[in-house]
Regions:
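Vicinal oxygen chelate
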Residues: 1-36, 46-74, 87-103
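Conserved SAM-binding loop
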Residues: 83
Length: 103
């Protein structure tokens, strides 16, 4: 199914001992942390970011065995944007790591 999926990620309750698993900076606080967009291909997206000299601020990371990976970037106003897509081939995603928010 094609379309747009927008996720507004809010850290409203401190369930992770102050660790916000969805931000690319160490300081954690309640509130809106970032917006997330679903993409078709994490590999193609990473290639496009590189081609356009857009720095990945965190990632690629996977949060579990759901078959998806995320990269985080910053817009010109320094807002965090998550780009999340399926893992087509783990071996073709350089630097893919499992992100443990409690580590």
């Amino acid at each position: 199914e094609k379309g747009v999926e927008i996720n507004l990620v809010i850290n409203g309750v401190n369930l992770n001992s102050g660790k916000n698993i969805l931000m690319d900076i160490p300081e954690k606080h309640p509130g809106l942390t970032h917006v997330a967009f679903r993409i078709d291909s994490i590999i193609d997206t990473m290639a496009s970011l590189d081609q356009h000299n857009i720095e990945i601020s965190q990632g690629p990371v996977t949060f579990g065995r759901d078959g998806e990976a995320s990269v985080f970037i910053r817009d010109p106003d320094r807002n965090t944007i998550e780009l999340r897509g399926r893992i087509e081939d783990e071996d073709k995603i350089p630097g893919l790591e499992f992100y443990d928010p409690n580590a």
